From Swiss-Prot:
This is Nuclear receptor-interacting protein 3. PANTHER family: ASPARTYL PROTEASE DDI-RELATED, NUCLEAR RECEPTOR-INTERACTING PROTEIN 3. Pfam families: Asp_protease (PF09668). Coiled coil: none annotated. GO terms for molecular function: aspartic-type endopeptidase activity. Gene3D superfamilies: Acid Proteases. It comes from the Eukaryota. It comes from Mus musculus (Mouse). GO terms for biological process: proteolysis.
Amino acid sequence: MFYSGLLTEGGRKETDMREAASLRQQRRMKQAVQFIHKDSADLLPLDGLKKLGSSKDTQPHNILQRRLMETNLSKLRSTRVPWASKTNKFNQAKSEGLKKCEDEDMILVSCQCAGKDVKALVDTGCQYNLISSACVDRLGLKDHVKSHKHEGEKLSLPRHLKVVGQIEHLMITVGSLRLDCQAAVVDDNEKSLSLGLQTLRSLKCIINLDKHRLIVGKTDKEEIPFVETVSVNDDNTSEA
């Protein structure tokens, strides 16, 4: 019985020691968790902190997760700006390229109008002679502009141009030929003048793309060379 009592007492001591060690370990773990909890919270921006409690939404790792998502979304939005900028630059380059192609396809010839040198566009896509309001101002033809006869009639014009008047007697010299023709005045800032299909037919014009010549005249034909298609506006501005 004596030995049995000693063994029992020894077992109790061992059990007590194990329980004490377990309690110490639990306290250390609790302290470690509290430290991590507090340390993680301290690393967060102050404006993102709430009173930390038992709610999962207010735990540090959840707040950090939300912050990470917000940061990623912010980065995603910021990366869209350069892409939009690239798209705009691409569209601008594309538009400039199309405009350049259109300019290169234009046929221009030198002529005189109101005693001044002008680059006239040979426009087979329009029935009428067109002169811009800017060109009217440059040539001093404002007094010759009259209201459009058929105001209710909408002329079929390229580039959605708006007719603001007409000139009944516009004197144009092409080569050695003098023309007395009508022209519709359009609201346009470019200093341009164009010869429409009606006038080209009346002159029996032939467009020779191989020789870059506009052949005019019914009997005594005359060849008018094309001029470089830099820009109608630039050409006529330089002559002002």
